[in-house]
């Protein structure tokens, strides 16, 4: 029976010890649960962190695509409008340059103003994608040519 008494005392002791543990366990359990909940949110935020750069990368790619598309669209638009409106203005200016170069025997005073106008117009046409931006240079060149009798 000594065994029985031991087991009874041990049986009696654990329920007594379990009761305080149960009372103590609920108090630390709520405190322990928020930190346990925080690591999953930390894991969730670390999992969300790679997703956000992915979103930003997609946005950057979209913005780059828009920029490239805009540049291509502007270039095509300038090619179409330059082909219709600028083709007639740019071609007569080139023969004038070829025409003025052989006239190097004439006085420089007659040749210089129109040559400078042609030079400005051609530089504008080469530097600008849209020939319409060079209309002022074209007008000055036409006036010079009319004044000099080159038209």
From Swiss-Prot:
Q: Where is the transit peptide?
A: 1-9
The highest taxon in the source lineage is Eukaryota
Q: Which stretch carries the motif Cx9C motif 2?
A: 134-144
Q: Which UniProt keywords apply?
A: Disulfide bond, Mitochondrion, Transit peptide
**Gene Ontology CC, one term:** nucleus
Placement of sequence motif Cx9C motif 1: 114-124
Q: What is its main location?
A: mitochondrion
The answer, when asked if Transit peptide is one of the entry's keywords, is yes
Compositionally biased intervals (Pro residues): 27-38
Give the CHCH domain ranges: 111-151
Q: Which intervals of the chain are annotated as region Disordered? A: 1-50, 75-110
Name any one GO molecular function: sequence-specific DNA binding
The molecule here is called Putative coiled-coil-helix-coiled-coil-helix domain-containing protein CHCHD2P9, mitochondrial
Organism, scientific name? Homo sapiens
Lineage in the entry?
Answer: Eukaryota, Metazoa, Chordata, Craniata, Vertebrata
